């Protein structure tokens, strides 16, 4: 196996990397130069661009949880800017590294959305969106016709988002990972 082939690190490479990290100075010990440094606030541009993907505003009510992580403020700001009514799950809105309301803070784990679903039911939400603590993944749950809630799989969520964008005439490429469904490819082919 060679470089950049997507394999898990094994011995002895893992130990060599750990040694190199341990030998490196801490980030605050590295001298920095102010020359040629420009601070760029990308938040506003990101929010504007993401809001453009939604287009028209909606009367959808979203229950949102960051599971004690960092995504609550930005997620709420973005979804509100898009015209959605957003209600944070209050018990999980503030970052807390102890994750006191979940046994394991992964929104894809069984039981992790229980508090969010309860909040969604209380406010009459149309959907629950749950971020993982570092906000690089999310899960969604929706009410069913019988009144219960159903957590969508990542493949289902991706397909719904892809279909939504394709129906709106979005251009560009759809991509999926090796472990995700090929349904996005079929959606793209259907819409040309």
Predicted feature locations:
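Glycine-rich phosphate-binding loop
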Residues: 1, 119-147
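Gly/Ser/Thr-enriched, mixed-charge loops and adjacent short helices
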Residues: 1-120
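Proline/glycine-rich low-complexity loops and linkers
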Residues: 12-13, 19-43, 144-192
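General beta-strand structural signal in soluble alpha/beta enzymes
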Residues: 64, 88-90, 129-131, 151-154, ...
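Gly/Ser/Thr-rich loops at beta-strand to alpha-helix junctions
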Residues: 66-72, 135-137, 180-182
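Short glycine/threonine-rich loop-to-helix capping motif typified by GTGT followed
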Residues: 70-77, 142-144, 189-190
């Amino acid at each position: 196996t060679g470089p950049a082939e997507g394999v898990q690190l094994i011995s002895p490479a893992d130990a060599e990397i750990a040694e190199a990290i341990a030998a490196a100075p801490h980030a605050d010990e590295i001298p920095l130069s102010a020359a040629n440094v420009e601070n760029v606030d990308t938040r506003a541009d990101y929010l504007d661009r993401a809001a453009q993907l939604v287009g028209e505003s909606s009367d959808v009510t979203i229950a949102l949880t960051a599971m004690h992580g960092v995504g609550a403020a930005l997620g709420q700001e973005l979804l509100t800017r898009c015209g959605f009514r957003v209600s944070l799950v209050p018990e999980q809105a503030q970052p807390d590294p102890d994750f006191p309301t979940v046994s394991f803070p992964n929104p894809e784990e069984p039981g992790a959305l229980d508090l969010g679903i309860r909040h969604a039911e209380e406010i009459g939400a149309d959907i629950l969106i749950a971020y993982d603590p570092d906000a690089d993944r999310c899960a969604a749950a929706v009410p069913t016709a019988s009144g219960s809630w159903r957590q969508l799989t990542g493949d289902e969520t991706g397909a719904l988002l892809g279909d939504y964008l394709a129906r709106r005439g979005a251009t560009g490429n759809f991509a999926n990972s090796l472990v995700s469904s090929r349904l996005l490819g079929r959606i793209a082919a259907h819409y040309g």
